[in-house]
Amino acid sequence: MLEKQHIQYFKNLVGGEDFFTDLAHLNAYCYDATKERHLPSGVIFPRNEQEISQILKYCNEHRIIIVPRGAGSGFTGGALSVSGGLVLSVEKHLDKILEIDTKNLIARVEPGVINKHFQNEVEKLNLFYPPDPASENQSTLGGNVAENAGGMRAAKYGITKDYVMAMRVVLANGEIIRAGKKTIKDVAGFNVAGLMIASEGCLGVISEITLKLLAKPPLKQSAMGVFNHIEDAMNAVYKTMSSGVTPVAMEFLDNLSIKAVEERFSKGLPKDAGAILITQVDGVVKEQIAWQLNEIEKHFKANGCVDFKIAQNEQEEQDLWFSRRNASQSISVYGKKKLNEDVTVPRASLPSLLQEVAKISQKYGFKIPCFGHTGDGNVHVNIMLEDPKKDLEKGHKAMEEIFQAAISLEGTLSGEHGIGLSKAKFMPLAFNHSEMELFRNIKKALDPNNILNPFKMGL
């Protein structure tokens, strides 16, 4: 609960239309994609960087918790206010594209710009912003930076960190810093921008981002490989990726995911397949596209692919990617609640990871449909609970074993969803005591009063 003096300060600062403590607003900002609920004490919508600075300075002086928030589309509770405090939302006012520099192929944006809107705007200029998280129609670029979001095109084009050139950040004490430059090369000083990426709002509030753009490839084409065994599909991934061909995307659905999508949408997927790989290539000339697809088909078939279909028109392209993008919602047929995480391993370890998941599924009796970005080793595992009240504890134990399997294969707890609340307790699986202390010391140096998004990331 905020004291009256604090309420009055925030109202005076941003006005009554941009600061709220009523239950309707608190309820609207108490949850994210996890559906877990934590009621904040207030919600504030700063109109500019200076207001962010004044808000943080005041909150730091009065020890008021601040939880930065974009669209609330995260899967780990990173934007939830677990101990009251103030949700600072950038979605209402800080949503402008400030500059698109076609000469230097960069753009400056405010943190509340929606990813897909930004993609659409730069494409009007024949430019290209590759990071395309599944939440691209909802998630903000500030949130993408805070989580280091990836997407399907990461196999060729990388993830958010590969496109962040610079940013402006408001620190916990209200000071404003610049991190990075518009230049391609910059080795002057520490890489503070890199430190802020994936920090989940624990180190500062991002107020502006400078992003790298690419020229848009004029041609693209997709294909699907069908495999009887999921291990064959996983082997095909790393052997194809190491052959000299670099597809834009290399995605997979396992048998459970295929069946779920077909049951819901009837897109013509092979329901008896052990797995499918959906891939896309791009380029400048048709011969380049044809060569890449031929090479992929060759490597797929050398590793157990029983059918290889190339999309022949735009509708077939859309159907392939519709199936992949809607796998997450389709698997709800298997349970009332899902525990979904996104472990990542080196590509060559994908067969071993999926074998371990199958063993854990059998051990605990849960259906665990899997799909994801195999081109970068990122697998979305979904433990389906038919009776959440009875099975939740057992489900968490199963997920912990999946985390342990990923770590044992030199992988990580999360490739793109982040740590937030849901994976915070598992951080010691991936980091030793000295490493966790380093994280805490960095947090303490930048936020000594621990007002910025506390309790996240195990900090």
Locate each region found by the language model.
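N-terminal accessory segments
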Residues: 1-32, 61-64, 299-317, 408-409, ...
